[in-house]
Amino acid sequence: MFALIDVNGMYASCEQAFRPDLANRAVAVLSNNDGNIVARNYLAKKAGLKMGDPYFKVRPIIERHNIAIFSSNYTLYASMSARFAAVVESLASHVEQYSIDELFVDCKGITAAMSLDAFGRQLREEVRRHTTLVCGVGIARTKTLAKLCNHAAKTWPATGGVVALDDGARLKKLMSILPVAEVWGVGHRTEKALATMGIKTVLDLARADTRLIRKTFGVVLERTVRELRGEACFSLEENPPAKQQIVVSRSFGQRVETLTDMQQAVTGFAARAAEKLRNERQYCRVISVFIRTSPYSVRDTQYANQATEKLTVATQDSRTIIQAAQALARIWREDIAYAKAGVMLADFSGKEAQLDLFDSATPSAGSEALMAVLDGINRRGKNQLFFAGQGIDNSFAMRRQMLSPDYTTDWRSIPIATIK
């Protein structure tokens, strides 16, 4: 048996967690550069906001319903996600973090102590008590069925936020009323293709010929069908595979037109990518930098390009990665308004593969110690120590005009209470 714990409106819920005044108010969160709606709580959905709505188009709805709007605060969301995971891991020994707001749990052995429904309610209550985040919990024989149960838990209030189904008749009833689009991994194109075969509900898919499904759509959807029948095909991944690449990129708040500004942006991306690389305890040999204009602009000259450097010796040193990212100069073109840039790291290896006795190049002396100091200082506050090449006054930085404080990672952001 598997449980899926999914936070309701994660980003919006994180914003409400430190703002009691927003408890009964509609809340929505915007994408990068405050462009589109990417998260909504229940009241914001009820007011008519939809995922992907452009902010400028829905401002009348926002003003009419007094909806609280926030820029995306990824630092806060990542911190709250870690707290959410820690609570669940304190109650279950086998946990897989599927996304920032979703965790799978292996429920093996749980029924010896309590019912699955009681376990689901305990998970939900402990997460709420320790983080204020409200979750939906779905429990079933397979991960795909647990996803369906979670959908039911979040859709119908009468469930109390928990649906645990091991009864064939009740599962069939649920599958008969849910459209096939609710199945994990079934996208819009697959849904349309299935409809032409007469498969419109989840139950229709569960009853489909697995050989035909495999021939038409591939082995992954065939396994999904088997999961709908109660056969576990997707196991719990407690230790996700190591990343094959790291990408740090941003769309700019305003167009970048000078090489100096772009070099500062790329230096910042390279520094952040190197930090992520060290967090993964990996080393890289390939560093790429890319720049592009907006594909949606009819006024700007269209241009996109990428430059790549391959190192002789793998590194995780920010200085080396930043230097390699200066390959930007090879692809830079003047008189162009750039909308986005980024740095990608690839060809990863562990520390044991860093040295090659036949190479003349060797890592910088004291590199690891210096990077450890850099990371240690920056753990106490973002960008407490940074590279001069990143610049100070980044007018081109991502637009986040409604950014909330970093309540959980910055002492200066903790609200002050006064007792009189």
From Swiss-Prot:
InterPro entries: DNA/RNA_pol_sf, DNA_pol_Y-fam_lit_finger_sf, DNA_pol_Y-fam_little_finger, DNA_polymerase-Y, DUF4113, Rev_trsase/Diguanyl_cyclase, UmuC
Family statement drawn from the similarity comment of this UniProt entry: Belongs to the DNA polymerase type-Y family.
Annotated source species: Escherichia coli
Transmembrane segments: none
NCBIfam families cross-referenced by the UniProt entry: PRK03609.1 (NF002955)
Superkingdom field: Bacteria
Record protein name field: Protein MucB
Keyword NAD included in the entry's annotation: no
Purpose of the protein: Involved in UV protection and mutation.
Pfam families: DUF4113 (PF13438), IMS (PF00817), IMS_C (PF11799)
Keyword annotations from UniProtKB, A to Z: DNA damage, DNA repair, Plasmid, SOS mutagenesis, SOS response
All residue ranges annotated as the UmuC domain in the record: 2-187
Note: The mucAB operon is the plasmid-borne analog of the E.coli umuDC operon.
Any one biological process term the GO annotation gives: SOS response
